[in-house]
Curated annotation (Swiss-Prot), chains A, B:
SUPFAM superfamilies: Nucleoside phosphorylase/phosphoribosyltransferase catalytic domain, Nucleoside phosphorylase/phosphoribosyltransferase N-terminal domain, Pyrimidine nucleoside phosphorylase C-terminal domain
Organism (species): Maricaulis maris (strain MCS10) (Caulobacter maris)
EC code: 2.4.2.4
Domain of life: Bacteria
Protein name, UniProt field: Putative thymidine phosphorylase
Gene3D superfamilies for the chain: 1.20.970.50, Nucleoside phosphorylase/phosphoribosyltransferase catalytic domain, Pyrimidine nucleoside phosphorylase-like, C-terminal domain
Catalytic activity: thymidine + phosphate = 2-deoxy-alpha-D-ribose 1-phosphate + thymine
MF annotations from Gene Ontology: 1,4-alpha-oligoglucan phosphorylase activity; thymidine phosphorylase activity
Keywords, ordered alphabetically: Glycosyltransferase, Transferase
Keyword Glycosyltransferase belongs to the record: yes
Alphabetical list of HAMAP family matching this protein: Thymid_phosp_2
Similarity comment: family membership: Belongs to the thymidine/pyrimidine-nucleoside phosphorylase family. Type 2 subfamily.
UniProt cross-references to PANTHER family, sorted A to Z: THYMIDINE PHOSPHORYLASE
């Protein structure tokens, strides 16, 4: 009835039995690799694969991934077939009918380090290398990723942990070497809608002869990331060789970091942070610095808006984050400067990928008077980099930056970058909009960045490129009842309605204060 | 180009446009509800649904669920069709071709409470009601569930939080009222492989005339839960009315708690805890007590094995957990007793659903001499309940329990329970096994419960019912080199090989110490 078997003779035999024929089902499961197998498949029985099991899958290319099993109880698949989601199919570089092999994955050893962190133990470089390596290899499910990020937020990460995490994140991807210095870079810690200085700063620095190979993120919890905005102006999904060609040709670029595999786990972590709407200090520092170090940056300016509804709300929080950035950065050999900026209201007029792109174009085309705050912010940041990179004398950076805007050289540099990345294009405009009017006479007294950003997201940003908000007033603006305060833009009626419902449920996001002492 | 629209006129219009035709794809996505839509579907565009969006879905039955969107880029679906996973299909009670309506779900407001907990703020009853309610409604993704459990483990839950969580978990499901007292119950905090006393205790208590409507869990991180074991002896997936009928007829039952919707979020939380391999004190107390209170228990005995490789490792940890159980239990009106038991080695011989069932049958059939430790443990626990329930005088419970085993009344009560639940059946045996022999002469000095449990899981338990481990020696057993120490049992060669590889990579799980002073 039961029989005794010789284990040592098994592997070869198994390797042939565990093969199925690949079929592209065309199901896009986002970042998750999913495989579909018939519930009556002999391999499920033989290997004890249960529904939702994590399975190691390999094809003829010899690449292997960990995928989640979904069982199929109808005739969607023929016997002997295995269905693969788009992500699984593309990662394994399969062709229709290829043989696919399935085995149990090795146990997820780094999970014990995650558990230790949950219970408050710090993680060392080995732990973090193991965790980040397993994330990069796709071995962490959403459950594991969320636990790692939650534990990291729950127990404040030490300086050593953040530095080690940064290094782990750099080491698991490519690291660019430009064979020269300085390589300048900038980053904004975000939280301020519309603060889209990057394309302007890159254009100015490149116009001044500096090398600025900028990789940017998509939005984490905001209505637009720089990559989202830049994508409305030119292609941003360049691979490393294309990025290198652009930078060698024109001196700079503005591309999506995710496509060049610099700090590749960052985007995975960002997806989870977005779902949880958290972004801890340690994770933020590691995310930013790993990207910069991997991109080969030597000199970095960090724009840190501070304000009651910005990401960094108080001067104390700013000082803590600044200290972390400075300490980790200098420890890793990065020349780093932090500029605290005014985070009390959005910068520019637009909030959302395309709407912010229109503001960028205004500044570069000498229509900066329409968005004076964005113009000032961009020239200050660019000026700092011009000085750090010795393209301008100390104290004269901002002046040179302004000059490069006015004389059109920054615009020409930007055009050259867009052309080199695949061609300049005009940002889209939204088919639907709704104007929110001032409910009374008075002065704009407060603007809630967070709820404004939320409304922009409900309107469809950043996924709907043209969606978002346009501000028609800023802090201190004199308003007359019925005058446009801001407008919602969206690509669909459903989204417009959704954003509108949210606004209707909220107190004023832009507060109009009646003047106390009318003249 | 852009047009202004009247928002107030939209909803009715949208409700007709947002309808697709249901198609059962037969894809089993486990607990997750998934919907499949063509990437070119007009609703995706109109509503701004992105890949992996969470969408509120409803059918003609008026039930609504939150499902995850997967886009389909091939002709798997015709235009106008929507595919639904098995979970989504069954929850919505659809028929082929039914109209299905899609809208944006309301924002997940309870997520802000989860974030507060991540950053160390305690949760109150309102927060917990909101979180548990959203979990019960399927609004939490794996990412959210994992963050909630991780945060709860990272910041020790206060007594108040655990009590409130327990109540939230009770209130979100059914609560049974048996119209009489006492209603006795037992629970083991687990961590000790093979400790399958429950079926024996229920049989004894029912034989003594007590009412014991026992609901049990499936395994969390162990090779078998009581429900897994009981399922090899009789059906356990009874709904509440079937459970009630069984208890009214024979005085007790042993059913799977998940099927009767008592504390329904518990199984969802357990799935995540299993993936993370964590089980915090607070979560454990809430999980156990919510099930017992919902089941209508008035008197509860908790078996708490303590040992270096049990779930509770030290007397300090036991005291802490005991204090939590006692305080939360009495606060919620439960008469509760905790018995610390020896957790230094497995109880009985078998580890795994069916292998443990065979041990249970041995005790009930007066072959308890083969599993003396299981017999003693079960009669002590049953004795305590007999005394609490006033079926035995103080100090005489264990004696009566033994008598009911010996005179066959416990066995007859067990047979009656199995019959009432749908019929007794014999547990399966595994087609493959491998014996691990003693590497030397000596005495069994230590047994590592955790690694033994892990090996049993790698062999396929609990999903493969017949899989697991049989111990041929216990602590203190005299061994001769080559004598059987334990054996691996599995339903597939793949699993046997997998468990074997693990054992080969480990130091001895059962340590044989050479005798220092041979006589």
């Amino acid at each position: 009835m039961t029989k005794m078997i010789d284990i040592s003779a098994m592997p070869a035999e198994l390797s042939e039995k565990n093969t199925l024929t690949a079929r592209r089902l065309g199901i896009d499961t986002h970042e998750h690799a999913v495989i579909y197998m018939r519930a009556d498949c002999h391999i499920c029985r033989a290997e004890g694969f249960n529904n939702h099991a994590r399975i190691k899958v390999s094809g003829p290319s010899n690449k292997a991934i960990i995928a989640t099993l979904n069982l199929v109880v109808t005739d969607l698949l023929s016997p002997g077939q295995i269905g693969l989601s788009e992500t699984a199919w593309l990662r394994l570089q399969l062709n229709e009918g290829d043989p696919v092999r399935l085995i149990h994955p090795a146990p997820l050893l780094s999970l014990s380090a995650v558990r230790a962190k949950i219970f408050g133990e710090p993680l060392d470089q080995n732990n973090l290398d193991a965790i980040v390596g397993d994330i990069a290899a796709g071995r962490f499910s959403d459950i594991h990723l969320s636990a790692f990020l939650t534990a990291s937020a729950a127990h404040e990460q030490s300086f050593e942990e953040i530095r080690d995490l940064t290094l782990s994140m750099v080491n698991v991807g490519q690291r660019l070497d430009w064979g020269r210095a300085p390589i300048v870079d900038k980053h904004c810690v975000g939280g301020l809608p519309g603060n889209r200085t990057t394309p302007i700063v890159v254009a100015i620095c490149v116009a001044a002869g500096l090398t600025m190979p900028k990789t940017s993120s998509r939005a984490i919890t905001s209505p637009a990331g720089t990559a989202d905005t830049m994508e409305t102006l030119a292609p941003v999904e360049l691979d490393v060789s294309a990025m290198r060609r652009v930078v060698e040709t024109v001196g700079g670029c503005i591309v999506w970091g995710g496509a060049v595999a610099l700090s590749p786990v960052d985007d995975t972590l960002i997806r989870i942070e977005r779902a949880l709407d958290i972004d801890s200090d340690g994770q933020l520092v590691a995310s930013v610095l790993s990207k910069k170090i991997a991109a080969g940056a030597t000199h970095l300016v960090i724009d840190m808006p501070v304000g009651p509804t910005a990401k960094v709300r108080t001067e104390e929080a700013a000082a803590r984050l600044e200290g972390l950035f400075a300490r980790v950065g200098s420890n890793l050999g990065l020349n780093l400067k932090i500029m605290r900026t005014d985070g009390s209201q959005p910068v520019g007029r637009g909030i959302g990928p395309a709407l912010e792109a229109w503001d960028v174009l205004a500044v570069l085309n000498n229509e900066g008077h329409n968005v004076p705050d964005l113009t000032v912010q961009a020239t200050l940041l660019a000026g700092e980099l011009l000085e750090m990179g010795q393209a301008a004398p100390a104290g004269r950076g901002a002046e040179l930056a302004t000059e490069l805007l006015v004389n059109g050289r920054a615009w020409r540099a930007f055009e050259a970058i867009c052309e080199a990345q695949g061609g300049f294009r005009e940002p889209p405009t939204a088919p639907h909009y709704q104007v929110i009017q001032s409910p009374r006479d008075g002065v704009v007294g407060r603007i809630d960045n967070r709820r404004l950003a939320k409304a922009a997201k409900l309107a469809g940003a950043p996924a709907s490129k043209a969606a978002g908000i346009v501000l028609h007033a800023k802090l201190g603006s004199q308003m007359v009842k019925g005058q446009p305060l801001y407008s919602l833009h969206s690509q669909s009626l459903g989204e417009l309605s959704y954003a509108h419902d949210y606004l209707a449920s909220q107190p004023e996001i832009i507060e109009i204060e009646e003047e106390q002492c009318p003249r």
